[in-house]
C-alpha cells in the first residue's frame, strides 16, 4: 500500500531539488528556444494521473491486453479531436515524439535504400529529414535541398531539379529553422511529377496551422507529422495525420505498433487530447496571433540594429540570426545570453564556415515568451537587450552589459510569471 502522505521532497530530496531548480529557472529566465513552450496546468495534471499505470498495446477496440475500456475512451477522444483540429481523415496519437512519428512514416512508405529528398539540416531542415548522422541518412539514400543563397528562401527550382534527377520514393517538406511560409502545393506538384510520396513535417508550425495562421498541409500531403509540444503547446509527444487512404492508414498503424513501439503512453495521450481541446478555443487563436506579432517585432528590431536575419524576416514564430562575419560565434552568443538569463540555441546558418558545435547563428522563437504574456513592446525591449550584448561582445566589454541585462531580465520575469502561485 502506498503512503499518500509521502512527498517527493521528503522521499527523494535530490530529485525534488532538481525539479524545484528547473521550475525556478523557467520563471527567472526568458525562454527563446523556438521549439520550447510552457504547457497548461491541465496538460501537466493529465500526465500525473493513474493512466500511467495502464498497458494498452494495440489500438482502441483492438488491444492485446484486457482492462483497456477506459484508456480506449481517452485515445478515441484524442484521435477525433486531432482529426477535427487539423481537418484530417486519419490520426495516430501514439508516437512518443516527432522523430518517432517520422521514423514510422519512413518505415511505412519506404524501404531501406530508397531515395528520400529532404531539407538540409544546415539550411534549416531537421535531423530526420536525411541528415547523415540520423537513421534517415543511414538507412535511406538521402538527397538534400536547401535555400537560395541570394534570397534565403527555399529553392523550389532546385527541389524540382533534384527530384527529376534522383526520382525519390518520398519528398519531405518541413523545417526546424526556417522563418517563411512553405508552399505545400508546389511540393505536391513536384512529388506528383516523379511519382513520389509527400510527407510534411509541420512540428514547428502545428499551433499556427491549428489557429488558421499558416497553410494547412494535411489534405495536400500524403502524410503529415508533428510534435504535440512546440507551438501546439501540448505534452511532449508526436502525432501522424493523413487524408483518406486505407492502404496508407494500415501501413502507418503497423509502422507505429508493432513496428516501432510497444505500449503507448496513455497518460500522455490524455494530455494530448486536452491540448487539442485547448487549441479549439478563441483564446488559443489570440495566442497564436500574438506569437507571430511578437516574432515579427523581434525580427524587425534585429534588422534595425544591423543584425541579419536569414530569409530577411519572419512569417511564423521563429527567426534564424546570421552572425557570419562577426568576431563572435553562435556558441559565444548563446553562452553570453545564457549568462544574462536569456535562453537561445546556437544554430548553423546557410554556408556556415564554422563547425556545427560552434556555428555562426542563433535560433530565436516566441512561443514561450508569448505564453507568459509578452507583447510587442516587451519583445522589442528584449531584442534591444540582445543586440546590446552582441555589440558588447564585439567591443570586448560584454561582462558589464550582461550584468545590466540580467538585472532587467529579472525584473521583466517577475512582471510576467509563467505559473502564477
Curated annotation (Swiss-Prot):
Residue numbers binding (6S)-5,6,7,8-tetrahydrofolate: 121, 125-127, 355-357
Question: Under the cellular component aspect of Gene Ontology, which terms does the record hold?
Answer: cytosol
Q: What class of enzyme is it?
A: transferase
Principal location? cytoplasm
Instruction: Give the GO terms filed under biological process for this record.
Output: glycine biosynthetic process from serine; tetrahydrofolate interconversion
Q: Which NCBIfam families match?
A: PRK00011.1 (NF000586)
The UniProt entry's sequence similarity note says: Belongs to the SHMT family.
- What does the annotation say about its assembly with partners? Homodimer.
Q: What does this protein do?
A: Catalyzes the reversible interconversion of serine and glycine with tetrahydrofolate (THF) serving as the one-carbon carrier. This reaction serves as the major source of one-carbon groups required for the biosynthesis of purines, thymidylate, methionine, and other important biomolecules. Also exhibits THF-independent aldolase activity toward beta-hydroxyamino acids, producing glycine and aldehydes, via a retro-aldol mechanism.
Q: What is this protein called?
A: Serine hydroxymethyltransferase
Amino acid at each position: 500500500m502506498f503512503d499518500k502522505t509521502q512527498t517527493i521532497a521528503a522521499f527523494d530530496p535530490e530529485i525534488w531539488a532538481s525539479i524545484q531548480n528547473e521550475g525556478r529557472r523557467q520563471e527567472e529566465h526568458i525562454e527563446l528556444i523556438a521549439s520550447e513552450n510552457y504547457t497548461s496546468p491541465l496538460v501537466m495534471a493529465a500526465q500525473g494521473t493513474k493512466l500511467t499505470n495502464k498497458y494498452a498495446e494495440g489500438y482502441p477496440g483492438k488491444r492485446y491486453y484486457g482492462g483497456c475500456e477506459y484508456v480506449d475512451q481517452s485515445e478515441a477522444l484524442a484521435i477525433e479531436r486531432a482529426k477535427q483540429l487539423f481537418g484530417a481523415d486519419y490520426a495516430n496519437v501514439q508516437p512518443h515524439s516527432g522523430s518517432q512519428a517520422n521514423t514510422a512514416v519512413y518505415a511505412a512508405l519506404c524501404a531501406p535504400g530508397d531515395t528520400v529528398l529532404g531539407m538540409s539540416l544546415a539550411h534549416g531542415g531537421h535531423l530526420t529529414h536525411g541528415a547523415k548522422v540520423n537513421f534517415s541518412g543511414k538507412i535511406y539514400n538521402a538527397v538534400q535541398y536547401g535555400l537560395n543563397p541570394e534570397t534565403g528562401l527555399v529553392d523550389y527550382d532546385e527541389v524540382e531539379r533534384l527530384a527529376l534527377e534522383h526520382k525519390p520514393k518520398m519528398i519531405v517538406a518541413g523545417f526546424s529553422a526556417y522563418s517563411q511560409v512553405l508552399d505545400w502545393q508546389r511540393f505536391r506538384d513536384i512529388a506528383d511529377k516523379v511519382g513520389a510520396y509527400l510527407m510534411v513535417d509541420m512540428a514547428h508550425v502545428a499551433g499556427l496551422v491549428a489557429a488558421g495562421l499558416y497553410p494547412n498541409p494535411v489534405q495536400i500531403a500524403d502524410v503529415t507529422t508533428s510534435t504535440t509540444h512546440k507551438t501546439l503547446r501540448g505534452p511532449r509527444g508526436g502525432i501522424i495525420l493523413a487524408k483518406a487512404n486505407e492502404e496508407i492508414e494500415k501501413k502507418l498503424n503497423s509502422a507505429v505498433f508493432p513496428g516501432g513501439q510497444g505500449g503507448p503512453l496513455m497518460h500522455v495521450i490524455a494530455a494530448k487530447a486536452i491540448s487539442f481541446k485547448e487549441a479549439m478555443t478563441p483564446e488559443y487563436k489570440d495566442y497564436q496571433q500574438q506569437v507571430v506579432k511578437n516574432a515579427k517585432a523581434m525580427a524587425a528590431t534585429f534588422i534595425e540594429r544591423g543584425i541579419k536575419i536569414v530569409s530577411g524576416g519572419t512569417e511564423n514564430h521563429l527567426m534564424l540570426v546570421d552572425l557570419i562575419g562577426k568576431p563572435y560565434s553562435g556558441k559565444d552568443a548563446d553562452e553570453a545570453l545564457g549568462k544574462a538569463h536569456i535562453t537561445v540555441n546556437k544554430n548553423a546558418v546557410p554556408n556556415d564556415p564554422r563547425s556545427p558545435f560552434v556555428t555562426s547563428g542563433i535560433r530565436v522563437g516566441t512561443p514561450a515568451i508569448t505564453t507568459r504574456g509578452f507583447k510587442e513592446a516587451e519583445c522589442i525591449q528584449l531584442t534591444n537587450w540582445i543586440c546590446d550584448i552582441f555589440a558588447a561582445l564585439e567591443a570586448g566589454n560584454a561582462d558589464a552589459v550582461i550584468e545590466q541585462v540580467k538585472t532587467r531580465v529579472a525584473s521583466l520575469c517577475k512582471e510576467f510569471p509563467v505559473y502564477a502561485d
